[in-house]
From Swiss-Prot:
Superkingdom field: Bacteria
Major enzyme class: oxidoreductase
EC annotation from Swiss-Prot or TrEMBL: 1.1.1.-
Keywords: NAD, Oxidoreductase
Name of the protein in its database record: Putative 2-hydroxyacid dehydrogenase SSP0606
Active-site residues from the entry: 237, 266, 284 (proton donor)
Pfam family, one: 2-Hacid_dh
Length: 318
């Protein structure tokens, strides 16, 4: 019988698609991230592995699999999988693009508004000490309308963020490896280099897909370029930002605030970040909506089914 191993719970809609094919489906149901030995045992006789974004699928795991034909990664990113080694072993690797676009863009913009208008701070105040009533100088934040947003990575998610920024009457700058003239026409965005973006943006959002060349792309030197009234928002990948440099920039008031959905050493969160009132933090929930997660479940199931039925998976990345 064809065997599918899943490295953690996924929405029922995908499981049902796999079971309807008559596949033997085994799913890790422990708490937290699956450990390597359990994963190696799980893939030993599996024909397919559905990995999660938090699942490290390295050479050791791949070598433990005797029959593996496909790794379907439940997430738009796939830096958790050694795709080059998988290719050498003739194993397809797929991801779930587009399913996360709207949900992650919505969270990105929610973070923009939350940090600019100090919403979590206000919520905490109301729940603890309370406040003395309305006053002209009390609890002021920043408006986003008329401000400049600088988007690092104008892919699917970055473009969706830009469309939301346009609705808020923001000026839009973007940077990335390539200029995208069609997007510029659609959104009214302007292509600039990273330094120009950092020097001019009031809100810098990171929406680039991670690769090793982007490690610590935002470091001490980059924070020094930013406006003292600017904000950094990261809903992409934690290691793009040097967290120690971010903490120092916030303490030194080189920037006004930050909002983070991802962290450099995730799931660990820098203790100093937790102490700063001008930082909004969320637990990597960029695509954590019922709609997005169900769609991702369908995508990994359908690509798994395609491969195991000798058809071409739709979203191969290697």
């Amino acid at each position: 019988m064809v065997k599918v191993y899943i490295a953690g719970p996924i929405p029922e809609v995908g499981l049902n698609l796999l079971k309807d094919q008559g596949f033997e489906v085994d799913m890790y149901e422990g708490t937290g991230i699956i450990d390597k030995e359990t994963l190696k045992q799980g893939v030993k006789d599996a024909d397919a592995l559905i990995s999660l974004l938090s699942t490290s699928v390295d050479k050791e795991v791949i070598d433990a699999a005797n029959n593996l034909k496909i790794i379907t990664n439940y997430g738009a990113g796939f830096n958790n999988v050694d795709i080059d080694y998988a290719r050498q072993q003739n194993i397809d690797v797929t991801n779930t693009p587009k399913a996360s676009t709207n949900s992650t863009a919505e969270l990105t913009f929610a973070l923009v508004l939350a940090v600019a208008r100090r919403i979590p701070e206000g919520d905490k105040l109301c729940r603890t000490t309370g406040f003395d009533g309305w006053a002209p100088l009390f609890f002021r934040g920043r408006e986003v309308s008329g401000k400049t947003i600088g988007i690092i990575g104008l892919g699917e998610i970055g473009s969706a963020v830009a469309r939301r920024a346009k609705a808020f009457d923001m000026n839009i700058l973007y940077t990335g490896p390539h200029q995208k003239v069609d997007k510029e026409r659609e959104i009214g965005a302007k292509y600039v280099d990273l330094e120009t973006l950092l020097k001019n943006a009031d809100f810098v959002t990171i929406n680039a897909a991670y690769n090793p060349s982007l490690h610590h792309q935002i470091d001490k030197a980059q924070f020094e370029m930013m406006k003292p009234t600017s904000y950094l928002i990261n809903a992409s990948r934690g290691p793009i930002v040097h967290e120690k440099a971010l903490v120092q920039a916030l303490k030194d008031k080189e920037i006004e605030g930050a909002a983070l959905d991802v962290f450099e050493f995730e799931p660990e969160i820098n203790d100093e970040l937790k102490t700063l009132d001008n930082v909004v933090i969320t637990p990597h929930i960029g695509n954590a909506t019922f709609e997005s997660r169900d769609m991702m479940s369908k995508i990994v199931a359908n690509d798994t089914i395609s491969k195991l039925n000798n058809d071409q998976p739709k979203f191969i990345v290697n």
